[in-house]
């Protein structure tokens, strides 16, 4: 009797286990297997069969995207439902081009399921704009139904809709309170030849410019701001862009005019406005609650945004923009940069023999590169020199150098001269100078001695004031009265021009 009941209950338990797993298998099969009928439909057929998407269906037909979504190529559609589209601006609906941009903002190439974002994806839509997709949202819209897999892609439905976000350049052009920034950047547009596919025949021996086969180059519109600073119209990068309202622009222009002087008033005005707008692009997106104390712009200048100065924040298709009525930064050695003239990069040389570039360690073990010409035994007119070309602001500079004499046993002297053209000058027309300074020898000194260590220190030479913004030629010149019995030399690591008030 006991054995009978035991076997009976064992059999019952076994049958229950089988039934449980069979049920699980059926449920899992139902969950995982796609709707076979749906896999025969295109995205357009799936959308048009859904009564809650009838308005979006109408827009697909009106813009020609119905044909796109009938093709064999894979797409993902985030379709706004009828309720989401009921308040769409009539001007967009009645403008075919605007409506096409709008609809294209909800279609992307390839299939994107809600399992893909970790935690988010930035996706390029068919209208060229970037959009943020997460497991549960599409931009600011919530995803109502997700991962509807059909023959040529994936459909998600969403509960709100908005016109495509502008990029930084498009947004700037809409700002009535920032016309000064907009107009100046627009003024930098120009026409040039695109030679990227040109067939080069030869280079002009006079101008050095290429001469191309007719019909292989073409004229294109470019903008110097986009070329030299950042293309703020590009959808291929994400940026933080600062827009100065007209009040802030004029404040900055008045502040910076003194450092961008020119003998030509129009040139000075252009230089000043360029200085105002060039340091406003950051190659990273900072939300308003993520703003650091300072942000480094693409030009290397550090800027500060006070939240109280922000007039408007706008999410862009290529980042975020802040319209501000004030911007902060350190002026000297930041906005007005320090000029570092590296010895090994001369613009021109006048020396009796080829100079030597050497890589060595200073007294602290730090590696540096200097340029040297040793045993100069004469002092011709003009003197021997290294010449360097740089661009300076109209400001007073403190002049420093680091120069080490490990060439001669005795000290030798050098000087630093300045000119706004490439001529070295003469006794009749001397250049602005900080005068001669003596370089003591380190030959024979113990590396641990103070004299040896001091020889590697930066040395203050004097000041030079640049009257105008522009090119400055800096000359490192040899000493006078050199002879075979009293030779001199040239030796330099760098010359530093530090701007000061």
Question: What kind of region is each of these model predictions?
Answer:
Residues 1-24:
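Sec-dependent bacterial lipoprotein signal peptides
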């Amino acid at each position: 009797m006991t054995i009978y009941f035991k076997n009976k209950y064992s059999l019952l338990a076994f049958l229950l286990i089988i039934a449980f797993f069979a049920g699980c298998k059926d449920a899992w099969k139902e969950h995982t297997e796609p709707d076979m009928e749906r896999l025969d439909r295109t995205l357009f057929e799936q959308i048009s069969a859904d009564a809650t998407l009838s308005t979006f269906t109408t827009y697909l037909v009106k813009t020609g995207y119905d044909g796109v979504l009938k093709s064999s190529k894979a797409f993902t559609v985030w379709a706004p439902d009828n309720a989401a589209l009921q308040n769409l601006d009539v001007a967009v609906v009645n403008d075919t081009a605007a409506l096409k941009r709008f609809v294209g903002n909800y279609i992307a190439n390839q299939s994107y399921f809600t399992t893909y974002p970790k935690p988010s994806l930035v996706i390029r839509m068919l209208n060229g704009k970037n959009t943020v997709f997460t497991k549960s949202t599409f931009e600011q819209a919530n995803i109502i139904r997700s991962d509807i897999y059909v023959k040529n892609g994936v459909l998600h439905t969403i509960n709100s809709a908005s016109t495509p976000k502008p990029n930084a350049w498009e947004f700037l052009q809409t700002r009535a309170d920032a016309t000064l920034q907009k107009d100046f950047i627009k003024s930098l547009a120009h026409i040039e030849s695109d030679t990227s596919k040109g067939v080069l025949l030869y280079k002009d021996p006079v101008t050095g410019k290429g001469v191309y086969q007719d019909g292989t180059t073409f004229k294109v519109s470019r903008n110097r701001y986009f070329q030299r600073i950042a293309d703020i119209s590009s959808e291929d990068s994400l940026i933080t862009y600062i827009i100065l309202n007209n009040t802030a622009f004029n404040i900055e222009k008045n502040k910076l005019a003194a450092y961008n002087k020119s003998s030509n008033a129009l040139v000075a005005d252009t230089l000043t406005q360029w200085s105002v707008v060039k340091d406003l692009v950051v190659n990273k997106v900072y939300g308003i609650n993520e703003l650091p104390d300072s942000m480094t712009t693409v030009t290397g200048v550090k800027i500060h945004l006070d939240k109280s100065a922000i007039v408007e924040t706008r999410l862009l298709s290529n980042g975020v923009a802040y319209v501000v009525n004030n911007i902060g930064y350190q002026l000297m050695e930041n906005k007005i940069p320090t000029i570092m003239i590296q010895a090994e990069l001369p613009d021109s040389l006048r020396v009796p023999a080829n100079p030597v570039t050497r890589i060595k360690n200073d007294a602290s073990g730090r590696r540096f590169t200097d340029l040297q010409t040793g045993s100069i035994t004469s002092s011709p007119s003009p003197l021997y020199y290294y010449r360097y070309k740089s661009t300076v602001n109209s400001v007073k500079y403190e002049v420093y150098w680091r120069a080490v004499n490990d060439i001669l046993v005795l000290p030798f002297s050098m000087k630093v001269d300045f000119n706004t053209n490439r001529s070295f000058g003469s006794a009749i027309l001397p250049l602005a100078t900080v005068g001669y300074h003596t370089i003591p020898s380190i030959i024979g000194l113990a590396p641990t001695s103070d004299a040896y260590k001091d020889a590697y220190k930066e040395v203050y030479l004097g000041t030079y004031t640049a009257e105008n913004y522009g090119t400055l030629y800096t000359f490192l010149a040899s000493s006078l009265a050199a002879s075979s019995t009293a030779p001199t030399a040239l030796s330099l690591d760098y010359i530093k021009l530090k701007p000061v008030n």
